[in-house]
Amino acid sequence: MDIIKQIKIYPPANDGISRILVIYEVEDVLPEEDNGHYLSIDLGLHNLMTCYDNVGKTFIIGREYLSLSYFYNKEIARVQSQWGRIQAAREMEDLKTSKHLQKLYRKKNDCIKDYIHKMTRYITNYCVKNEIHTVVIGDIKGIRKERNLGRKTNQKLHGLPYARIYMQLEYKLKMKGICLIRQEESYSSQCPPQSEEVSHIYAEKRNRKKRGIYIVDTVIYNADAVGAYNILRKYHAVSGKKIDMPVTGLSSTKTIKVAV
């Protein structure tokens, strides 16, 4: 049982909200031994997290994130425009942010934090239920600087909360004794699952016929599922561990909906 060590109560700040900080002690959890059961995760734009379970299952979680973010961004832009016209009409020299706008920013941030918490909790519970002791996640460090994917796509990438996902997932898994490993993921979305290795030598951009689809000969795969699969292949190559990796499930990916 967790032992509460300290409770701090902060009075309302400028936003009018009181905050309570609870500090509690938890027992150290020893890392589970590698049992050959893995989950790999490909972080994306439209599908925030695509997961491959090496028993031959795949699922997508986080598809609602972009629409959630778009809704608040659109509403914030609308209120900003209205407030700008009001300040101009009143000839206000000391420009301030409206309380309505502050409330919208706060609500957006809280909503996204809650959504990421629910996603990472689902993945943690999935690993515990299925006795997965190692999670391998694609390391997208530098991707937003190195790639020019167009103005709109780059704009969306810069707004994605990848650092928060890493942090939330890492601490939740650690509390269950599950290891989280970041794996460099270059060419993971371009190489066929049957290629000898995941590298520029076997990269086939033309196999991605359109967004979400990856075709090898006559077989149609989910492109993000292929990415998650290849991330685990890259980990297999650098770790030297023997990992069973059936391609079943790459064509039929289940979508997990998270309450917003």
Where are these regions (language model features)?
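Acidic carboxylate diad motif detector
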Residues: 1-14, 159
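Positively charged, helix-rich recognition surfaces that bind polyanionic ligands
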Residues: 14-260
